[in-house]
Amino acid sequence: MKFTTAAVLSALVSAEIAFAAPGGNGFARRQARRQARAAGLKASPFRQVNAKEATVESNWGGAILIGSDFDTVSATANVPSASGGSSAAGTAWVGIDGDTCQTAILQTGFDWYGDGTYDAWYEWYPEVSDDFSGITISEGDSIQMSVTATSDTSGSATLENLTTGQKVSKSFSNESSGSLCRTNAEFIIEDFEECNSNGSDCEFVPFASFSPAVEFTDCSVTSDGESVSLDDAQITQVIINNQDVTDCSVSGTTVSCSYV
């Protein structure tokens, strides 16, 4: 499991801002989440702490590669069912940076909520995340996620529902909010945070139990155009109240995370 340094952790704790948690039900709640994101809610970089007072000691579960010049990260993941009530949530995504480098994250993925609703989203952290339009996600769907960094400040995020055939993409160009280091590549299950509009008050959402296990299959990473093996990936778990709530592992080109 990867541990952040004290300096990185200090910077992270002061900047813990994430995309919105659920509000009401159905369309109105999804609209509220979109409005909340527009108000300034963001995804969180990797957080790992040992403080006794911390409720969520690790907010990422999955696989992290540390290297250089990462260009692309892609995988296909199944959409699980979730429980835990309308306020409970979780997310699955692929991305570049956010662990040892936290100046920016290029990422895309999908959220699940305890009432059976789902979102598809993209983000260039520290800018706000946003929902994709033109794509729907349902339990059991197969979602292909990919991000491409063409430079430290430009790239793209693409999401395709292989079950329905819907495909959406977002391009980023000359992003001034933060530059990628391109030193991390990730396949992640996350317990994300809900913050107010200016990011001054953040809380982790209740982490929704999910089943079956989320499997990132056909995981692919390239560095300067060359394929990178997952053999050296570091495994992390979501840890809440000193308990692992995910069981993540890597086998070949598959990253599997189950709820425990």
From Swiss-Prot:
Residues 21-54 form a propeptide. GO terms for biological process: proteolysis. GO terms for molecular function: aspartic-type endopeptidase activity; glutamic-type endopeptidase activity. SUPFAM superfamilies: Concanavalin A-like lectins/glucanases. InterPro entries: ConA-like_dom_sf, Peptidase_G1, Peptidase_G1_sf, Scytalidoglutamic_peptidase. The record marks 107 as: Transition state stabilizer. It catalyses: Hydrolysis of proteins with broad specificity, cleaving 24-Phe-|-Phe-25, but not 15-Leu-|-Tyr-16 and 25-Phe-|-Tyr-26 in the B chain of insulin. Disulfide bonds join 101-181, 195-219, 248-257. Coiled coil: none annotated. Residues 1-20 form the signal peptide. The active site is at residue 190. It holds the Pfam family Peptidase_A4. Its EC number is 3.4.23.32. Keywords: Aspartyl protease, Disulfide bond, Hydrolase, Protease, Signal, Zymogen. Gene3D superfamilies: Peptidase G1. It is an enzyme of class 3 (hydrolase). Monomer. Belongs to the peptidase G1 family. This is Scytalidopepsin B. It comes from Scytalidium lignicola (Hyphomycete).
